[in-house]
């Protein structure tokens, strides 16, 4: 058999994790927009749900995203001290800690849930966080909970509506 006729082993397709991003309207969502307007390259394997404040993100929202097939969830808000609603991001920390304990009880790895502060001017930071989170989830593999994938949220859709729709 000649060298030309040797067939290469078929390449295994790369698995792309599904991420749900809950983003504060005033900072994190604007940071994602800055990344897009600036044409900063990042991986596209996430669905954005815009909320008015990161303090509004209840554990049930995150758990529903996992239930509907998300491999990871990113909660993002204004930097501490820069919250449009003054103390919303402090409330987000409290909610995040509650959510983290429930996720742990479900047997999911802590690395599937992430909290980040991203300002409107930090488009490059948003892109870097998305890329890092996707690589972290690739190392963990698919979520052991459910196989369904989460669709995108419609513009102006409330978080409850976006999650209930899936």
Question: Where are the regions a protein language model picked out?
Answer:
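Iron-sulfur-associated redox domains of electron-transfer enzymes in respiratory
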Residues: 1-166
């Amino acid at each position: 058999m000649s060298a030309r006729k040797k067939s290469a082993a078929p390449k295994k397709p790369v698995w792309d994790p599904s991420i749900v991003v809950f983003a504060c309207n005033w900072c994190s969502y604007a940071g994602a927009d800055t990344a897009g307007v600036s044409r900063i390259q990042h991986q596209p394997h996430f669905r954005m749900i815009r909320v008015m404040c990161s303090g509004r993100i209840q554990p049930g929202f995150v758990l529903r995203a996992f239930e509907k097939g998300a491999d990871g969830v990113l909660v993002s808000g204004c930097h501490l001290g820069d919250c449009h609603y003054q103390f919303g991001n402090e409330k987000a920390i409290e909610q995040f800690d509650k959510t983290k304990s429930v996720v742990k009880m479900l047997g999911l790895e802590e690395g599937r849930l992430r909290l980040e502060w991203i300002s409107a001017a930090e488009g490059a930071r948003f892109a870097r966080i998305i890329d890092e989170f996707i690589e972290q989830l690739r190392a963990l593999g698919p979520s052991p909970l459910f196989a369904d994938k989460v669709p995108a949220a419609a513009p102006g859709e409330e978080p409850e509506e976006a999650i209930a729709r899936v």
